[in-house]
């Protein structure tokens, strides 16, 4: 049975951890879905790990839709969420409705994710959810604000910053978000947020007290040339693939592949 947004909330109530990962193509999405991942996010992180951009900022709505269509063809069980990229929702609720509507209509995804929880974004979330578009929030370190942050530092360390993030979490929950991504914040702040909101919190670099965890699949598979300190590679595919290609190349050059026909 396919995972739903309501099911995630039920799992929070039961204390059942939520497993989430990113995917950007058909093959990886199929593997994740078959492995029983609960939530698959087509993140705008694809700009950095798949398209080669330095940040997520250049990613377009068309690029998100293109990759999300491929993922949708593979996913049968997991809940599929797609990021709204930079400047496709910040201008107005109407812009957000148009962008989110395109994603749901053209890709078949069940929900969208957007960053920040300030007053304007909370109102946008309220508008989206009021017309039936499920929204996942994302607070703490929000990559679309990389230049404002001056990089990717941990957020919420100062008391005023911690209070602001908590306020954003409460506002997004009140606005109707079905879940929150908490990125790169202190574990005690993530714990406080998790205890105070009725919707699931999905941590990425936010400690062990969240209702679930998410990582970029390239980091999990050891494909990234750099990964954040909170990521954990479970295999080193970067090395494995490089070695496999070198062996293939050597066999071709020595005419060992393909094998000549037997006499």
From Swiss-Prot:
Subcellular location per the Swiss-Prot or TrEMBL entry: Cytoplasm
CDD domains: KPHMT-like
Principal subcellular localisation of the protein: cytoplasm
EC number per UniProt: 2.1.2.11
Disulfide bonds: none
Pathway stated in the Swiss-Prot or TrEMBL entry: Cofactor biosynthesis; (R)-pantothenate biosynthesis; (R)-pantoate from 3-methyl-2-oxobutanoate: step 1/2
Cofactor: Mg(2+)
Key words, A-Z: Cytoplasm, Magnesium, Metal-binding, Pantothenate biosynthesis, Transferase
Any single Gene Ontology cellular-component annotation: cytoplasm
Residue numbers binding 3-methyl-2-oxobutanoate: 44-45, 83, 113
Active site: residue positions: 183
Superkingdom of the source species: Bacteria
GO biological process: pantothenate biosynthetic process
Positions that bind Mg(2+): 44, 83, 115
Catalyzed chemical reaction(s): 3-methyl-2-oxobutanoate + (6R)-5,10-methylene-5,6,7,8-tetrahydrofolate + H2O = 2-dehydropantoate + (6S)-5,6,7,8-tetrahydrofolate
GO molecular function: 3-methyl-2-oxobutanoate hydroxymethyltransferase activity; magnesium ion binding
Cofactor note: Binds 1 Mg(2+) ion per subunit.
Keyword Cytoplasm set for record: yes
Function per UniProt: Catalyzes the reversible reaction in which hydroxymethyl group from 5,10-methylenetetrahydrofolate is transferred onto alpha-ketoisovalerate to form ketopantoate.
Family: Belongs to the PanB family.
Subunit structure: Homodecamer; pentamer of dimers.
Protein name in the entry: 3-methyl-2-oxobutanoate hydroxymethyltransferase
Organism annotation: Trichodesmium erythraeum (strain IMS101)
Lineage: Bacteria, Bacillati, Cyanobacteriota, Cyanophyceae, Oscillatoriophycideae
Gene: panB
């Amino acid at each position: 049975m396919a995972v739903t947004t309501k099911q995630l909330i039920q799992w929070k109530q039961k204390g059942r951890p939520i497993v989430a990962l990113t995917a950007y193509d058909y093959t990886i999405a199929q593997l994740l879905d078959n492995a029983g991942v609960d939530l698959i996010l087509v993140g705008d992180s694809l700009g950095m790990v798949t398209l080669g951009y330095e940040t997520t900022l250049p990613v377009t709505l068309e690029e998100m839709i293109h990759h999300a269509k491929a993922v949708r063809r593979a996913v049968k069980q997991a809940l599929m969420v797609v990021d709204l990229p930079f400047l496709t929702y910040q201008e107005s609720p109407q812009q957000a409705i148009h962008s989110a509507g395109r994603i749901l209509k053209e890709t078949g995804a069940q929900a969208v994710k957007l960053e920040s929880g300030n007053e304007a974004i909370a109102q946008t979330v309220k508008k989206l959810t009021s017309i039936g578009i499920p929204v996942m929030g994302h607070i703490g370190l929000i990559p679309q604000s990389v230049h404002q942050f001056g990089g990717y530092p941990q957020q919420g360390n100062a008391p005023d910053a911690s209070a602001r993030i908590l306020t954003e979490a409460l506002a997004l929950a009140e606005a109707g978000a079905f879940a929150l991504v908490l990125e790169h914040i202190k574990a005690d702040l993530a714990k406080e947020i998790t205890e105070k909101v009725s919707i699931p919190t999905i941590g990425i670099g936010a400690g062990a007290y969240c209702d679930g965890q998410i990582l970029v699949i390239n980091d999990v598979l050891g494909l990234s040339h750099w990964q954040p300190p909170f990521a954990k590679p479970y295999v080193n595919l970067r090395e494995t693939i490089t070695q496999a290609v070198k062996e293939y190349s050597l066999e071709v050059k020595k005419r060992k592949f393909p094998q000549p026909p037997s006499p």
